[in-house]
Amino acid sequence: MKELSSAQIRQMWLDFWKSKGHSVEPSANLVPVNDPTLLWINSGVATLKKYFDGSVIPENPRITNAQKSIRTNDIENVGKTARHHTMFEMLGNFSIGDYFRDEAIEWGFELLTSPEWFDFPKDKLYMTYYPDDKDSYNRWIACGVEPSHLVPIEDNFWEIGAGPSGPDTEIFFDRGEDFDPENIGLRLLAEDIENDRYIEIWNIVLSQFNADPAVPRSEYKELPNKNIDTGAGLERLAAVMQGAKTNFETDLFMPIIREVEKLSGKTYDPDGDNMSFKVIADHIRALSFAIGDGALPGNEGRGYVLRRLLRRAVMHGRRLGINETFLYKLVPTVGQIMESYYPEVLEKRDFIEKIVKREEETFARTIDAGSGHLDSLLAQLKAEGKDTLEGKDIFKLYDTYGFPVELTEELAEDAGYKIDHEGFKSAMKEQQDRARAAVVKGGSMGMQNETLAGIVEESRFEYDTYSLESSLSVIIADNERTEAVSEGQALLVFAQTPFYAEMGGQVADHGVIKNDKGDTVAEVVDVQKAPNGQPLHTVNVLASLSVGTNYTLEINKERRLAVEKNHTATHLLHAALHNVIGEHATQAGSLNEEEFLRFDFTHFEAVSNEELRHIEQEVNEQIWNDLTITTTETDVETAKEMGAMALFGEKYGKVVRVVQIGNYSVELCGGTHLNNSSEIGLFKIVKEEGIGSGTRRIIAVTGRQAFEAYRNQEDALKEIAATVKAPQLKDAAAKVQALSDSLRDLQKENVELKEKAAAAAAGDVFKDIQEAKGVRFIASQVDVADAGALRTFADNWKQKDYSDVLVLVAAIGEKVNVLVASKTKDVHAGNMIKGLAPIVAGRGGGKPDMAMAGGSDASKIAELLAAVAENL
């Protein structure tokens, strides 16, 4: 077996499959493009779903890739095991309706065992297969695999919801008896026992059925095109080929671990307690790549995942004695390890470091809050006479504050308390079940559509015309091809068309189709790309249409021009964002409609009003500069040399279209555009908002809509000026400010009057002191306007020695508000209010010294007051 670096393994994989006629698919962005079912790209096949479900036909049906991926269902296991990772590389080879089982197995065996390639010893390889899949068993035997090395496994059948599915065969490397201390042997594989002896290095999925959840597996229909989908983890291959005990001792992780050793002053021990080193090395890889691909830490979705990873890594840094910000210092090491195939980390190093360091600094403040929360929980345990911290509280510390359970346990034990491990595991499992359910729900590839995939007739979109005559090539009605149609809705393909198919954020053209007499025979309501790339017109049929007949196709010119104004303005906006807030503000999505444009971009904070003003001004300057718009068709490399901005994550063909707006903007784009920037007329931003962690959205209008937006603003300003009696529009702001100042003064005066009234009323309330169980208490119903007044009562009560406990009840509107305050350690206000609140059909809680509750049954207020003594 050859001893290769991870970069050599990756390159040898790609070279082998290229020698078998495969095209190399570049690694896609970790943030899925146009796939709301995925949080992250989580496998090599994830970016190829469009090929497997038949919605797009690839140029070459044989594909290979090395795809960076993220999976976060088992974050808590990272560092504990030899092979769990958040970010990993999946090497794959794929056949879309081309070769199948025989070639997949034979070539796979050749790559692994040939001296020209990986040169694995054959006697160290074991294969599992689906028991009913005798063909795979026989093919392995034909390759020279001993029957004793073939293990039937019932679970070797791959399916996720509806869509392509089939048996799979997995390849394992046997590391020997040293990794099997109990000498269990092949039962480890046959019974799926977690072990370090048999390492799964490759899975070959034989995708031959259309899975249908409504029928038994035995009734699945055969796919019209059978596919091959494989995945081999680079980290595992590297561990095996480099003789490493775990994935972390390979050249993919050890340089990071060495840097952590320098920062911590600690030494990594492969056989000792090294979990913190592993967690940090794994998580900084995921953070560096994900942030480089446009994801940013936040409170939801993928942003929440990144925040959780960073906080877990920071806490493990503290366990190693690293108390200052340090993760950002590891970003260059990650970039250097991966530079040969993934240059983007080093290219975006400054930005990634900035985001990581900023998030570390924010978390330092959060740690203080988490420590305070833990202190409060431990104090509550002491007051209640308990000795165990509940699982739900441990999980909150873990989930909200980023405290690893080991740290919580350590701090709790130092204070003399135990922790509820089982309760924590239960809370963790509930979260994992929710996450996995969401993945299963959204993971289906969708069924193949044989009718659409079967369209092979050529069709060409013509950019520079609004009307043309063309022959009708294909009619599809009720999902079947037909020669003619006279009513209903149908899908049409023409030899050439002026209708733009929805793509790249630009909506489809609408229009009409006319016969040779000039009569309208169909209305075009949508245009989408067919699997083989032809514009597929969805039409409402008004009169007879037949294949082979020529028709005149006319788009709605006014609508097209409105869309083009917004699309061209989008390019100007993208460039302006780069200039004003930074080059990290890359496109995360766009929509160019007739009435507006919507542009999503990566950014870590809200765009300020001043920045929006600069962006809007810069775009309008380019409109007024009368810039010529040109388009050029070339290859991707030449386009990049021209300075063209490519959308990261998009896949481009051999020939790309470059849209250049003067010397201001150059982008790869297949959409339609104006001839000159001045045709946009006017640009106005109407909204800026956050739509998810690290993603902002700008909605803007152009031309007539921009004018209307400005006029509406002016009308609103005139109305405000009239309301505040401003003599001129320019005086309206000053008048509003004067009224606001006056209102604030009146509100302050009102608060002072309320406080005086409360203080006067408190004198009477505080006179009625009772005693029970050795505790002096006051229990009274008071007449106040809001719950804040109850707190004012409590503040006044605390200043003097009226009693040990105060209980106040107020009926405010239809609600009942209850306050309990305590000055004695013998009475816990939060616990006491839990006993009182249910009397008035309410609930509440709080701290030992102050608690509040809300209820709905005012008729029971007297009963609540009577129950105070027994609840002390």
Curated annotation (Swiss-Prot):
Disulfide bonds: none annotated. Binds 1 zinc ion per subunit. Its cofactor is Zn(2+). It catalyses: tRNA(Ala) + L-alanine + ATP = L-alanyl-tRNA(Ala) + AMP + diphosphate. Zn(2+) binds at H567, H571, C669, H673. One of its GO terms (biological process) is alanyl-tRNA aminoacylation. One of its GO terms (molecular function) is alanine-tRNA ligase activity. NCBIfam families: alaS. The keyword Chloroplast does not apply. InterPro entries: aa-tRNA-synth_II/BPL/LPL (IPR045864), Ala-tRNA-lgiase_IIc (IPR002318), Ala-tRNA-ligase_IIc_anticod-bd (IPR018162), Ala-tRNA-synth_IIc_core (IPR018165), Ala-tRNA-synth_IIc_N (IPR018164), Ala-tRNA_ligase (IPR050058), Ala_tRNA_ligase_euk/bac (IPR023033), DHHA1_dom (IPR003156). It comes from Streptococcus agalactiae serotype V (strain ATCC BAA-611 / 2603 V/R). It comes from the Bacteria. Transmembrane segments: none annotated. Belongs to the class-II aminoacyl-tRNA synthetase family. Keywords: Aminoacyl-tRNA synthetase, ATP-binding, Cytoplasm, Ligase, Metal-binding, Nucleotide-binding, Protein biosynthesis, RNA-binding, tRNA-binding, Zinc. This is Alanine--tRNA ligase. It holds the Pfam family tRNA_SAD. It is found in: Cytoplasm. One of its GO terms (cellular component) is cytosol. It is an enzyme of class 6 (ligase). The lineage of its organism: Bacteria, Bacillati, Bacillota, Bacilli, Lactobacillales. Its EC number is 6.1.1.7. Consists of three domains; the N-terminal catalytic domain, the editing domain and the C-terminal C-Ala domain. The editing domain removes incorrectly charged amino acids, while the C-Ala domain, along with tRNA(Ala), serves as a bridge to cooperatively bring together the editing and aminoacylation centers thus stimulating deacylation of misacylated tRNAs. The keyword Ion transport does not apply. Catalyzes the attachment of alanine to tRNA(Ala) in a two-step reaction: alanine is first activated by ATP to form Ala-AMP and then transferred to the acceptor end of tRNA(Ala). Also edits incorrectly charged Ser-tRNA(Ala) and Gly-tRNA(Ala) via its editing domain. PROSITE patterns: AA_TRNA_LIGASE_II_ALA.
